[in-house]
Structure formats: structure tokens, C-alpha cells
Amino acid sequence: IMAMTTIDKMKDIFNGPKTLLYSKAITDLSKATVDITPEVELPVTVDSLKAAMDDPTVNHYKVIGLAGDWATTAELGDFNVEFVVPSKAKDLLTIMFGEDAITELTKVTLKGTGDATLDATTGFTGIAVEPKKFKIKGTIVIVDDEKENLMVITNIALYATLQWDNSGTEPVAFKFSGSIEGAGKRSIAWLTKGTTTGDV
């Protein structure tokens, strides 16, 4: 007879996210040894990071004369991922909308405002973006505050939307939201730093 697993053995938790890393590559989590090469570290607004599954849809089959279910079937709920990034950096805009949606503006000049600072001939530089529908694919790695544990979510399919609701107190930000396109694939992993080479 196998011994019961006691509650102290169940304290295997993940919390306190500190850093979110993004890689455009899909990660094969069915392999025992995996390399992930992030391209960018994303600044994520506190408490905006969410990863949760919707409740399952339960179908109840009943027969005459019995109060309970004769049979039940279910469909799993969608896995939802979302977070908010308060940045308008070029690298971020490229991730969100694609290379072809980005144009670098080398000089934009304001004229006739009557404000010498705004009308300066030096002009302004920046980035123009077409905020089109663009599927963000790849892998995100969430690092805990002790850098000892990781949560990896791959096969992501996210979309970005501009958010600037509280313009007096908050910066321009983009909300990433979407799901996992990983039917039949291992798409989530929780990892703990190995104590020696080769440990996981």
C-alpha cells in the first residue's frame, strides 16, 4: 500500500512574479531538456498579470424518474492570459503589431503654434504605428522574485490593445490578452532552479 502524501509534501507553490520575459519561438515542453532564448524583458504593471482557465461547461443528461444526473460530459474552459505593459518602445511596438506596421519618423515639425519650444526647427522624432490586428505568438517566462522558480507558458496567441484610461495619472500602456493554441500539446511548466548541473 502506498503511503499517503502528507500536507507538507504538497507545499510546492509559485508566487511573487518579478519579471516577465518573451520569446517569439514556441517551446517544446514535451522534451526533458529545453533551451529558451528570450528576446525582451517586459515591464508589466503590478497585479495586471493573469493566467486562468474558465470554468468547464458541464452537460447534464437526465432520465425520467431520477433526480440526479444519469450521465455528465464536460468541455474544458478556455485558458486566458493577460497583462499590461506601460511602454511605447519600438521593440515592443514591433512585437505587438509586426515589422511592417512600424515607421521611424526622423523629423516632424510643428508650425504656427506661437510656442517657440514647440515650433523649434529641430522638430520631433519618433515611431508611427498601424494598430492592426496581429497575433503575438511564442513563449512567456515568468520569473519569481527570488529567481529560483519559473512559470513557462508557450503556444500563446495574444493580441495587444492600447490602454490610456487614466491619462492624468498613468502612462500610455498596451494590454496583452489571449489564450493558448496548444491543443494536444504541453503548454505550461513550473520549474525550480537545479542544485547541480543537469537538475531541474
Regions found by a protein language model. Give the residues of each.
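Polar/acidic, low-complexity leader/linker segments enriched in S/T/G and N/D
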Residues: 2-44, 197-200
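Charged, amphipathic alpha-helical segments
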Residues: 3-7, 86-129
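Short, surface-exposed beta-strand/loop "edge" segments at domain boundaries and coil↔beta transitions
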Residues: 28-31, 90-93, 142-153, 184-188
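N-terminal beta-strand/beta-hairpin edge segment
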Residues: 42-59
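Short acidic (Asp/Glu) patches
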Residues: 57-69
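Oligomerization/assembly interface segments of phage tail-like spikes and tubes
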Residues: 68-93, 169-185
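Acidic, glycine-rich flexible loop segments
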Residues: 119-165
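Mixed-charge, glycine-accented linear interaction segment located at domain edges/termini
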Residues: 148-200
